[in-house]
Amino acid sequence: MNIAANNRLVFSEEQGMILDSAREFCRDKSAISAVRALLESENGFDEAVWQQMVELGWLGLAIPEEFGGSGLGIGATVPLAESMGRYLLATPFFSTTLAAQLFARAGTSAQKNHWLPLLANGTRASLALLDGEDWGAKAFTATAEASAGKLTLSGEKW
């Protein structure tokens, strides 16, 4: 990926192929009626679509090969992110990719060996909690509660 003289992103051939398949996938999986339904759903994303993204290898694009990823680097996720934004495809892709980058760049060997394969194969995903207008809260409390095989996270920020 390069930036041309007119400040436009120019994708590599590999990124162009990812962009083409991502646009088609996101367009097909993200009809406006589906987006609206997901807003009201319990988990906010379609697990079948998530599983298809796993099968396409998209969760491991930026994860090193030794941990089950493709090792293509964070730049390989840009075409996918562009397509997901264009078509409003709701998944935990962004937060999971960011969590994987955190482990890859700053994790201990034990953390990398444990978490990166799970994130690459879709067994685990990450959340981004951006609810409400005040993203600059000074403090917060959070409680996670397990019940009937589900984890409920609740909290308060101020």
Regions found by a protein language model. Give the residues of each.
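Short secondary-structure junction/hinge motifs that connect adjacent elements
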Residues: 33-55
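Catalytic cores of phosphodiester-bond-cleaving enzymes
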Residues: 1-2, 27, 41
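Glycine-rich, Trp-frequent "lid" loop and neighboring beta-strands that shape
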Residues: 69-70, 110-158
